[in-house]
């Protein structure tokens, strides 16, 4: 009795009308099993503006005005709230392209104009990526906006899933698909961009060939985010929305959750979170753990299950990042992490390390020494990506180049030098792998992925300071182990919660978990992405 697989229409609550996917199918009647029956039964959950004037008709977007001279529009591919998508032909060379034609008269609010401008900027920024639909140009006349893009006629990922036996991919084929989605997410995140609507309908195959590359499309809900700021609005598609989106405190991690949901579906043909109503789906997302017991999960490899579980961690800080996920053994290409991009979370950890108290830096160094290098594949990949000359250490120039890739943060050279100095514990002017691990470590993930091992590691780190083994770190023990001079008591204040002049194991673990930078919970201003980061 299976019915339509895909989720309800993408939603943006509280920030205006958006309908980014002109021809994607949406949820009709409810069914747990994937099927393509009744694929046309759709239900929109998007909030729309009511009334207003044709604001877009009064705006000159500054785009080229010679579309009709350059292209000839052909058959219709799909349509949405604001316009239509067509196949078109380049009059100069005969090449076929896709053209998204948007009716200015239907843009009745300023935010809808800003949405179009932002989507064009995003396509311009990402258009050179191998797994993002190519951007050619944007045009306008008095009536329409024309966004000219690469034509991908291989169909949606959704259709490929539905065509598979039991709507399932083999693990090998699923890994190929997931790897391409993760590359898109990692590139977006480096640019300070969050896609915010990753789902099978928003990925197209370049051609109908079996090995065709996958291309991300539809950035209508995508947005740029300020460092240290979280999105408050609820956007996306119900089946793929992350818990933190529903809590109105979301960031780049939400894209990884969505890819985790897609991976689950690719491997078993079912959704991990399902209900007949949207509110029911949200309740499942917030409270339920994905099932890995029912068929076919017993026959799926432990590596695949481990990968999916680490993407579907409800606490975003403990979830793998997109770049980390590319280093996971299950998704690696031929056992190697090919072209792993620099991870924004690693760069962020290195920036934060400078702001940590001296005590926390010392505690993190002790914790890092308890971890075997073979457990640090993702950080080794990151270190190698930053170590351009492959000499086994990161120089000031290599650090500068790495930090420059994180587009939202425009750090001055003096700040880069400060970060390198904080990471360089032996003061030789370079950061080796051991020093790098201390600053780049994801402590929240250590606890989430293996709580028993976390208990052992944090205890081992604690014991390095607890010389007499009485279960507490005293100022004198800290002085003996660190060689610090002067008054030690001020150092203890951050960790000594009960103010008894010493640090217990629980206080020590709390110190390791804590972060000195906290994200502010504010709304993303509608025009922010147009004034900052490109």
Curated annotation (Swiss-Prot):
Explain the purpose of this protein.
May play a role in signal transduction pathways that involve calcium as a second messenger.
List the PANTHER family hit by this protein, alphabetically. Answer: SERINE/THREONINE-PROTEIN KINASE (PTHR24349)
- One GO CC annotation: membrane
EF-hand domain span: 374-409, 411-446, 453-488, 491-518
Region annotation Disordered: residue ranges? 1-49
- For the region Autoinhibitory domain, give the residue spans: 337-367
Could you name the active-site residues? Answer: 197 (proton acceptor)
Positions modified as Phosphoserine? 237, 504
Which Gene3D superfamilies does its entry note?
EF-hand, Phosphorylase Kinase, domain 1, Transferase(Phosphotransferase) domain 1
Sequence positions that bind ATP: 77-85, 100
Stated family: Belongs to the protein kinase superfamily. Ser/Thr protein kinase family. CDPK subfamily.
Q: How is its activity regulated?
A: Activated by calcium. Autophosphorylation may play an important role in the regulation of the kinase activity.
- Show the InterPro entries listed in the entry: CDPK_Ser/Thr_kinases, EF-hand-dom_pair, EF_Hand_1_Ca_BS, EF_hand_dom, Kinase-like_dom_sf, Prot_kinase_dom, Protein_kinase_ATP_BS, Ser/Thr_kinase_AS
Would you tell me the protein name for this molecule? Calcium-dependent protein kinase 18
Binding of Ca(2+) 2: at which residues?
424, 426, 428, 435
- Please write the reaction equations for the catalytic activity of this protein: L-seryl-[protein] + ATP = O-phospho-L-seryl-[protein] + ADP + H(+); L-threonyl-[protein] + ATP = O-phospho-L-threonyl-[protein] + ADP + H(+)
Amino-acid positions noted as binding Ca(2+) 4 in the UniProt annotation, renumbered to this chain: 496, 498, 500, 502, 507
Q: Where does Ca(2+) 3 bind?
A: 466, 468, 470, 477
What is a single molecular function from GO for this protein? protein serine kinase activity
Q: Does the keyword Nucleus apply?
A: no
The segment(s) forming the Protein kinase domain are 71-331
Q: Where is the lipid attached (N-myristoyl glycine)?
A: 2
